[in-house]
Design a protein with these regions (language model features):
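Substrate-binding clefts and catalytic carboxylate motifs of secreted carbohydrate-active enzymes
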Residues: 168, 183-187, 197, 207, ...
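Short gly/pro/ser/thr-enriched loop/turn and capping motifs at secondary-structure boundaries
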Residues: 132-140, 222-224, 267-268, 299-300
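Acidic-and-aromatic substrate-binding clefts and catalytic sites of carbohydrate-active enzymes
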Residues: 103-112, 192-197, 223-225, 245, ...
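Secreted/periplasmic carbohydrate-active enzymes, especially glycoside hydrolases
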Residues: 1-125, 170, 185-186, 202-208, ...
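Aromatic- and acidic-residue-enriched carbohydrate-binding clefts of CAZyme catalytic domains
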Residues: 68-73, 81, 128-175, 179, ...
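Active-site neighborhood of glycoside hydrolase catalytic domains
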Residues: 120, 155-256
Length: 350
Protein backbone atom coordinates (compact mmCIF):
# COMPACT_ATOMS: atom_id res chain seq x y z
CA UNK A 1 0.00 0.00 0.00
CA UNK A 2 1.56 3.30 -1.06
CA UNK A 3 1.33 6.33 1.21
CA UNK A 4 -0.08 9.56 -0.18
CA UNK A 5 3.14 11.45 0.45
CA UNK A 6 2.24 13.51 3.51
CA UNK A 7 2.74 13.16 7.24
CA UNK A 8 -0.61 13.43 9.00
CA UNK A 9 0.69 13.01 12.53
CA UNK A 10 4.07 12.55 14.17
CA UNK A 11 4.66 10.85 17.49
CA UNK A 12 6.20 8.00 19.46
CA UNK A 13 4.66 4.56 19.90
CA UNK A 14 5.90 2.41 22.78
CA UNK A 15 5.36 -1.32 23.13
CA UNK A 16 6.92 -3.97 25.37
CA UNK A 17 8.36 -7.36 24.44
CA UNK A 18 8.61 -9.57 27.51
CA UNK A 19 11.82 -11.63 27.77
CA UNK A 20 12.93 -11.04 24.18
CA UNK A 21 15.30 -13.40 22.43
CA UNK A 22 18.44 -11.30 22.03
CA UNK A 23 20.04 -10.72 18.65
CA UNK A 24 23.70 -11.68 18.23
CA UNK A 25 26.05 -12.78 15.46
CA UNK A 26 25.56 -16.49 16.17
CA UNK A 27 21.78 -16.31 16.60
CA UNK A 28 20.52 -13.20 14.75
CA UNK A 29 16.95 -13.50 15.97
CA UNK A 30 14.54 -10.97 14.45
CA UNK A 31 10.95 -10.02 15.24
CA UNK A 32 8.48 -8.93 12.57
CA UNK A 33 6.80 -5.58 13.22
CA UNK A 34 3.77 -4.42 11.21
CA UNK A 35 2.59 -0.80 11.35
CA UNK A 36 -0.87 -0.28 9.87
CA UNK A 37 -2.71 2.98 9.20
CA UNK A 38 -5.74 3.64 7.00
CA UNK A 39 -3.45 4.59 4.10
CA UNK A 40 -0.24 2.65 4.62
CA UNK A 41 1.27 -0.61 5.86
CA UNK A 42 4.94 -0.82 6.87
CA UNK A 43 6.57 -4.18 7.62
CA UNK A 44 9.98 -4.34 9.27
CA UNK A 45 12.15 -6.83 11.13
CA UNK A 46 13.85 -5.68 14.32
CA UNK A 47 16.11 -7.19 16.93
CA UNK A 48 16.97 -6.61 20.57
CA UNK A 49 20.46 -6.52 22.06
CA UNK A 50 22.41 -4.52 24.62
CA UNK A 51 25.74 -2.72 24.26
CA UNK A 52 27.83 -1.68 27.25
CA UNK A 53 31.40 -0.62 27.95
CA UNK A 54 32.87 -1.37 31.37
CA UNK A 55 36.51 -0.88 32.35
CA UNK A 56 37.37 -0.26 28.68
CA UNK A 57 35.87 -3.61 27.62
CA UNK A 58 32.94 -3.89 25.18
CA UNK A 59 30.04 -6.21 25.98
CA UNK A 60 27.18 -7.26 23.70
CA UNK A 61 24.31 -8.80 25.67
CA UNK A 62 26.64 -9.00 28.66
CA UNK A 63 29.30 -11.00 26.78
CA UNK A 64 32.78 -9.72 25.91
CA UNK A 65 33.19 -9.39 22.17
CA UNK A 66 35.95 -9.24 19.58
CA UNK A 67 35.33 -7.63 16.21
CA UNK A 68 36.60 -9.98 13.50
CA UNK A 69 35.90 -7.34 10.92
CA UNK A 70 36.57 -6.23 7.38
CA UNK A 71 36.22 -2.91 5.55
CA UNK A 72 33.82 -3.21 2.64
CA UNK A 73 33.35 -0.83 -0.30
CA UNK A 74 30.47 -1.09 -2.76
CA UNK A 75 32.17 -2.48 -5.85
CA UNK A 76 31.06 -4.77 -8.65
CA UNK A 77 33.10 -5.59 -11.78
CA UNK A 78 30.04 -5.14 -14.02
CA UNK A 79 27.93 -2.49 -12.26
CA UNK A 80 30.66 -0.44 -10.58
CA UNK A 81 29.59 1.32 -7.40
CA UNK A 82 26.04 -0.07 -7.62
CA UNK A 83 25.79 -3.39 -5.81
CA UNK A 84 22.74 -5.60 -6.04
CA UNK A 85 21.08 -7.67 -3.34
CA UNK A 86 22.62 -10.78 -4.90
CA UNK A 87 26.12 -9.30 -4.87
CA UNK A 88 25.80 -8.33 -1.22
CA UNK A 89 24.46 -11.81 -0.44
CA UNK A 90 27.56 -13.27 -2.10
CA UNK A 91 29.81 -11.00 -0.02
CA UNK A 92 28.10 -11.78 3.28
CA UNK A 93 28.07 -15.51 2.61
CA UNK A 94 31.80 -15.51 1.81
CA UNK A 95 32.53 -13.44 4.91
CA UNK A 96 30.63 -15.88 7.13
CA UNK A 97 32.44 -18.81 5.54
CA UNK A 98 35.77 -17.18 6.38
CA UNK A 99 34.98 -16.32 10.01
CA UNK A 100 34.20 -12.60 9.84
CA UNK A 101 31.56 -11.29 12.24
CA UNK A 102 31.72 -7.53 11.59
CA UNK A 103 31.79 -5.03 8.71
CA UNK A 104 32.71 -1.35 8.48
CA UNK A 105 30.70 0.50 5.81
CA UNK A 106 33.77 2.29 4.55
CA UNK A 107 33.34 5.16 3.92
CA UNK A 108 29.64 5.94 3.57
CA UNK A 109 26.25 4.57 4.55
CA UNK A 110 25.25 1.66 2.34
CA UNK A 111 21.89 0.89 0.74
CA UNK A 112 19.20 0.07 3.33
CA UNK A 113 18.99 -3.55 2.19
CA UNK A 114 22.65 -4.06 3.13
CA UNK A 115 21.82 -3.49 6.81
CA UNK A 116 18.67 -5.60 6.60
CA UNK A 117 20.78 -8.46 5.29
CA UNK A 118 23.39 -7.92 8.02
CA UNK A 119 20.55 -8.12 10.55
CA UNK A 120 19.54 -11.45 9.04
CA UNK A 121 23.00 -12.96 8.54
CA UNK A 122 24.36 -11.84 11.88
CA UNK A 123 27.05 -9.19 11.34
CA UNK A 124 27.97 -6.35 13.67
CA UNK A 125 28.30 -3.16 11.62
CA UNK A 126 30.15 0.13 11.97
CA UNK A 127 27.90 2.55 10.11
CA UNK A 128 30.08 5.34 8.75
CA UNK A 129 29.00 8.83 7.70
CA UNK A 130 29.97 9.92 4.19
CA UNK A 131 32.56 12.45 5.34
CA UNK A 132 35.98 12.24 3.72
CA UNK A 133 38.44 15.13 3.54
CA UNK A 134 41.52 13.25 2.43
CA UNK A 135 41.24 14.64 -1.09
CA UNK A 136 40.00 18.20 -0.44
CA UNK A 137 42.79 18.73 2.06
CA UNK A 138 45.31 18.49 -0.77
CA UNK A 139 44.03 21.87 -1.98
CA UNK A 140 45.30 23.49 1.21
CA UNK A 141 48.61 21.69 1.62
CA UNK A 142 51.76 23.76 1.63
CA UNK A 143 55.02 22.42 3.01
CA UNK A 144 54.62 18.65 3.33
CA UNK A 145 55.49 18.02 6.96
CA UNK A 146 53.46 16.13 9.56
CA UNK A 147 52.98 19.28 11.64
CA UNK A 148 51.70 21.34 8.70
CA UNK A 149 49.59 18.47 7.39
CA UNK A 150 47.76 17.89 10.66
CA UNK A 151 47.40 21.58 11.52
CA UNK A 152 45.96 22.56 8.13
CA UNK A 153 43.76 19.48 7.98
CA UNK A 154 42.05 20.61 11.16
CA UNK A 155 42.02 24.31 10.48
CA UNK A 156 40.49 24.24 7.02
CA UNK A 157 37.65 21.74 7.48
CA UNK A 158 37.24 19.96 10.82
CA UNK A 159 37.79 23.09 12.90
CA UNK A 160 36.16 25.64 10.59
CA UNK A 161 32.57 26.40 11.74
CA UNK A 162 31.62 27.03 8.11
CA UNK A 163 31.66 23.25 7.65
CA UNK A 164 29.57 22.47 10.75
CA UNK A 165 26.26 22.17 8.93
CA UNK A 166 27.64 19.87 6.24
CA UNK A 167 29.36 17.56 8.73
CA UNK A 168 26.62 17.38 11.36
CA UNK A 169 23.90 16.99 8.73
CA UNK A 170 25.54 13.93 7.18
CA UNK A 171 25.93 12.27 10.57
CA UNK A 172 22.31 13.02 11.49
CA UNK A 173 20.98 11.66 8.19
CA UNK A 174 22.86 8.41 8.74
CA UNK A 175 21.75 7.94 12.34
CA UNK A 176 18.12 8.87 11.68
CA UNK A 177 17.85 6.53 8.71
CA UNK A 178 19.55 3.50 10.27
CA UNK A 179 18.65 3.81 13.96
CA UNK A 180 16.40 0.72 14.01
CA UNK A 181 18.91 -1.77 12.64
CA UNK A 182 20.17 -4.16 15.36
CA UNK A 183 23.28 -5.03 13.35
CA UNK A 184 24.61 -1.48 13.82
CA UNK A 185 26.56 -1.42 17.06
CA UNK A 186 28.73 1.60 16.29
CA UNK A 187 28.46 5.01 14.62
CA UNK A 188 31.54 6.35 12.84
CA UNK A 189 31.78 10.08 12.20
CA UNK A 190 33.59 9.61 8.91
CA UNK A 191 37.02 8.85 7.54
CA UNK A 192 40.32 10.71 7.55
CA UNK A 193 38.94 14.22 7.99
CA UNK A 194 40.90 15.29 11.09
CA UNK A 195 39.27 16.60 14.28
CA UNK A 196 37.79 19.84 15.49
CA UNK A 197 34.70 21.67 16.70
CA UNK A 198 32.52 20.27 13.91
CA UNK A 199 33.14 16.68 14.94
CA UNK A 200 32.66 17.60 18.59
CA UNK A 201 29.18 18.83 17.60
CA UNK A 202 28.46 15.70 15.55
CA UNK A 203 29.54 13.42 18.39
CA UNK A 204 27.54 15.36 20.97
CA UNK A 205 24.37 15.15 18.86
CA UNK A 206 24.90 11.43 18.22
CA UNK A 207 25.39 10.60 21.89
CA UNK A 208 22.38 12.65 22.94
CA UNK A 209 20.18 10.97 20.31
CA UNK A 210 21.51 7.42 20.75
CA UNK A 211 23.47 7.06 24.01
CA UNK A 212 23.73 3.25 23.87
CA UNK A 213 25.57 2.67 20.62
CA UNK A 214 29.35 3.08 20.48
CA UNK A 215 30.93 6.09 18.78
CA UNK A 216 34.25 5.95 16.96
CA UNK A 217 36.31 8.30 14.84
CA UNK A 218 39.91 7.38 14.09
CA UNK A 219 40.83 10.85 12.84
CA UNK A 220 40.30 12.27 16.32
CA UNK A 221 44.01 11.68 16.87
CA UNK A 222 44.85 14.22 14.14
CA UNK A 223 44.52 17.47 16.00
CA UNK A 224 45.88 20.96 16.35
CA UNK A 225 48.02 20.68 19.47
CA UNK A 226 47.51 24.38 20.22
CA UNK A 227 43.83 23.67 21.00
CA UNK A 228 42.27 21.57 23.75
CA UNK A 229 39.50 19.40 22.32
CA UNK A 230 36.66 17.51 23.95
CA UNK A 231 36.68 13.72 23.50
CA UNK A 232 34.02 12.89 26.11
CA UNK A 233 31.53 11.66 23.49
CA UNK A 234 34.06 9.40 21.78
CA UNK A 235 33.92 5.85 23.16
CA UNK A 236 36.94 4.24 21.52
CA UNK A 237 40.58 4.87 20.83
CA UNK A 238 40.90 3.68 17.23
CA UNK A 239 43.91 3.50 14.97
CA UNK A 240 44.88 2.60 11.45
CA UNK A 241 47.91 0.39 10.86
CA UNK A 242 49.69 0.83 14.20
CA UNK A 243 52.73 -1.27 15.00
CA UNK A 244 52.21 -3.89 17.68
CA UNK A 245 54.53 -1.90 19.94
CA UNK A 246 52.22 1.14 19.68
CA UNK A 247 49.25 -0.94 20.80
CA UNK A 248 51.20 -2.31 23.75
CA UNK A 249 52.30 1.21 24.70
CA UNK A 250 48.70 2.48 24.72
CA UNK A 251 47.47 -0.41 26.84
CA UNK A 252 50.33 0.00 29.31
CA UNK A 253 50.34 3.80 29.62
CA UNK A 254 46.67 4.67 29.07
CA UNK A 255 44.11 2.03 28.14
CA UNK A 256 41.21 4.15 29.40
CA UNK A 257 39.10 3.33 26.32
CA UNK A 258 38.73 0.17 24.22
CA UNK A 259 41.32 -0.03 21.44
CA UNK A 260 40.02 -0.68 17.91
CA UNK A 261 42.02 -1.42 14.78
CA UNK A 262 39.68 0.38 12.40
CA UNK A 263 42.02 -0.59 9.55
CA UNK A 264 44.90 -3.07 9.65
CA UNK A 265 46.72 -5.67 7.54
CA UNK A 266 46.37 -3.75 4.26
CA UNK A 267 45.71 -6.61 1.86
CA UNK A 268 47.67 -5.51 -1.19
CA UNK A 269 50.20 -8.14 -2.20
CA UNK A 270 51.59 -9.85 0.89
CA UNK A 271 50.06 -7.25 3.22
CA UNK A 272 47.95 -9.80 5.14
CA UNK A 273 51.09 -11.67 6.15
CA UNK A 274 50.91 -10.61 9.80
CA UNK A 275 47.36 -11.70 10.69
CA UNK A 276 48.60 -14.11 13.33
CA UNK A 277 50.71 -11.48 15.12
CA UNK A 278 47.76 -9.09 15.34
CA UNK A 279 45.34 -11.80 16.41
CA UNK A 280 47.64 -12.75 19.27
CA UNK A 281 47.66 -9.10 20.36
CA UNK A 282 43.87 -8.80 20.02
CA UNK A 283 43.28 -11.82 22.26
CA UNK A 284 45.98 -10.86 24.74
CA UNK A 285 43.96 -8.07 26.39
CA UNK A 286 40.18 -7.65 26.79
CA UNK A 287 40.55 -3.93 26.09
CA UNK A 288 41.58 -4.83 22.53
CA UNK A 289 38.13 -5.16 20.97
CA UNK A 290 39.35 -6.37 17.57
CA UNK A 291 39.89 -4.93 14.15
CA UNK A 292 38.75 -4.46 10.56
CA UNK A 293 41.01 -5.70 7.77
CA UNK A 294 41.58 -3.39 4.82
CA UNK A 295 39.83 -4.39 2.64
CA UNK A 296 37.26 -6.81 1.23
CA UNK A 297 37.53 -6.70 -2.57
CA UNK A 298 39.69 -5.51 -5.43
CA UNK A 299 38.13 -2.58 -7.31
CA UNK A 300 38.20 -3.11 -11.06
CA UNK A 301 35.83 -3.11 -14.02
CA UNK A 302 35.33 -6.16 -16.25
CA UNK A 303 36.37 -5.24 -19.79
CA UNK A 304 35.79 -8.23 -22.02
CA UNK A 305 37.75 -11.44 -22.31
CA UNK A 306 41.29 -12.29 -23.33
CA UNK A 307 42.04 -14.90 -26.00
CA UNK A 308 42.33 -17.54 -23.29
CA UNK A 309 38.80 -16.83 -22.07
CA UNK A 310 39.82 -15.07 -18.85
CA UNK A 311 38.17 -11.78 -17.89
CA UNK A 312 40.15 -8.59 -18.51
CA UNK A 313 39.92 -6.08 -15.65
CA UNK A 314 40.62 -2.36 -16.04
CA UNK A 315 41.82 -0.11 -13.23
CA UNK A 316 44.30 2.62 -12.38
CA UNK A 317 44.54 4.59 -15.63
CA UNK A 318 43.43 1.86 -18.02
CA UNK A 319 40.71 4.16 -19.37
CA UNK A 320 43.14 6.99 -20.03
CA UNK A 321 42.35 9.00 -16.92
CA UNK A 322 45.14 11.34 -15.78
CA UNK A 323 44.47 11.23 -12.03
CA UNK A 324 44.18 7.71 -10.63
CA UNK A 325 45.45 5.45 -7.86
CA UNK A 326 47.44 3.04 -10.03
CA UNK A 327 47.11 -0.42 -8.45
CA UNK A 328 46.18 0.97 -5.03
CA UNK A 329 42.56 -0.08 -5.54
CA UNK A 330 43.64 -3.70 -6.00
CA UNK A 331 44.08 -4.40 -2.32
CA UNK A 332 41.30 -6.80 -1.40
CA UNK A 333 40.95 -10.21 0.17
CA UNK A 334 38.99 -11.30 -2.92
CA UNK A 335 39.33 -10.63 -6.63
CA UNK A 336 36.72 -8.39 -8.32
CA UNK A 337 34.66 -11.52 -9.15
CA UNK A 338 34.94 -12.61 -5.48
CA UNK A 339 37.42 -15.46 -5.96
CA UNK A 340 39.43 -15.62 -2.72
CA UNK A 341 42.97 -14.33 -2.56
CA UNK A 342 45.48 -16.24 -0.45
CA UNK A 343 45.07 -13.58 2.24
CA UNK A 344 41.43 -14.54 2.78
CA UNK A 345 42.37 -18.19 3.23
CA UNK A 346 45.04 -17.19 5.72
CA UNK A 347 42.55 -15.07 7.67
CA UNK A 348 40.19 -18.03 8.01
CA UNK A 349 43.03 -20.26 9.14
CA UNK A 350 44.25 -17.79 11.78
Amino acid sequence: IVANGETVKDGVIEFTVVNPILWNTENPYLYKVIFTTPDEVIVDRIGFRTITIKDAVIYINGEKIKFRGVNRHDSDPKTGFVTSVNQIKTDLTLMKQHNFNAIRSSHYPNAPYFYQMCDEYGFMVIDEADIEAHGPFMLYRKEDTDQNRFHLWNEKIADDPAWEGAIVDRVQLMVERDKNRPCIVMWSMGNESAYGCNFEKALKWTKSFDPERITQYESARYRNYDITYNYDDLDLYSRMYPALSEIEEYLEKDGSKPFLLVEYCHSMGNGPGDFEDYFQMIHKDDRMCGGFVWEWCDHAIAHGEADNGKTIYHYGGDHGEIVHDSNFCMDGLVYPDRRPHTGLLKYKNV
